[in-house]
């Protein structure tokens, strides 16, 4: 399979900051290692980036109480490792091209609930921004 012929998935991600400017990260249900990520996902047909970001954030964390601080100008993209192409996203994409946002969490931690309709995270925490490179999935 020539993976370069596969398109990039259109996606969004959000850096959620709490009152201490720590970043929300979730431990993925489908990743056995000690790797974490920020809420992110695909853009559905007919959605704009802001709508997709808010939907993904709610679907993954139940968080609604946010204020968007910034929409990053640059899009970021990543390619899946070869062993995951054909498995993730039913083999339709080779990676993701994402629009990222920074948002301030205005609620209480009790608002966060990972037991959603289709849970993606099994655990969550707030971390200092400088620790992100040490904990996030390496190809993202």
Model-derived features: positions:
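Conserved N-terminal beta-strand and adjoining loop/helix that marks the start
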Residues: 2-23, 45
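A conserved beta-turn-beta hairpin within the catalytic core of GNAT-like acetyltransferases
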Residues: 31-34
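A short gly/proline-enriched turn/hairpin at secondary-structure junctions
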Residues: 37-38
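Unchanged
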Residues: 44-138
